[in-house]
């Protein structure tokens, strides 16, 4: 399974568990931050063709919409949680640089800024625009894209 960083394309910031713990509690918010360290590495665990779990490599917890609803409303926070179920399935869209939830909403920085400050929450939203693009890069070279479906 490939280990990677999730990089906000417009700002160059990275997805992190808030607080940077190697074993964050369930429902720990996911934020954007400029730091790079081993506690913000991710892996993608394919479950059904293109759908899978975005796994926090250090803890094994996975990315969820807060509350675990099948169709989370706009502005639902993204968190880490230990449970694995269909409501936590995402696809990594390399062609459009999006992360899409099984219900059809996308990962966004809260507020939709192209240059969000450190500690900006990440949320689910149905809009598509340049500020919600993410790329998947190597922990050894933050400018080198990696394939997560391997």
From Swiss-Prot:
Optimum hemagglutination activity at pH 7.4. Retains its hemagglutination activity throughout pH range 3-10. This protein is most stable at pH 7.4. Hemagglutination activity is not dependent on divalent cations. Hemagglutination activity is highly inhibited by D-galactose and N-acetyl-D-galactosamine, and to a lesser extent by raffinose. Also inhibited by melibiose and alpha-lactose, but not by beta-lactose or D-glucose. Optimum hemagglutination activity between 37 and 40 degrees Celsius. Retains its hemagglutination activity up to 60 degrees Celsius, but loses the activity at higher temperatures. This protein is stable at high temperatures over 80 degrees Celsius. The thermal stability is increased by the presence of ligand D-galactose. D-galactose 2 binds at residues 27, 64, 67, 83-85. Signal peptide: none annotated. Keywords: Glycoprotein, Hemagglutinin, Lectin. One of its GO terms (molecular function) is galactose binding. D-galactose 1 binds at residues 16, 19, 35-37, 119. Glycans are attached at residues 26, 74, 118. D-galactose 3 binds at residues 75, 108, 111, 127-129. Glycosylated. Homodimer. Likely to form large oligomers; oligomerization enhances hemagglutination activity. D-galactose-binding lectin. Also binds N-acetyl-D-galactosamine. Has hemagglutination activity towards all types of human erythrocytes (O, A and B) and rabbit erythrocytes. Agglutinates Gram-negative and Gram-positive bacteria including E.coli DH5-alpha and L.plantarum ATCC8014, respectively, and has bacteriostatic activity against them. Also agglutinates M.lysodeikticus. May be involved in innate immunity by recognizing and eliminating pathogens. This is Galactose-binding lectin. It comes from Mytilus californianus (California mussel).
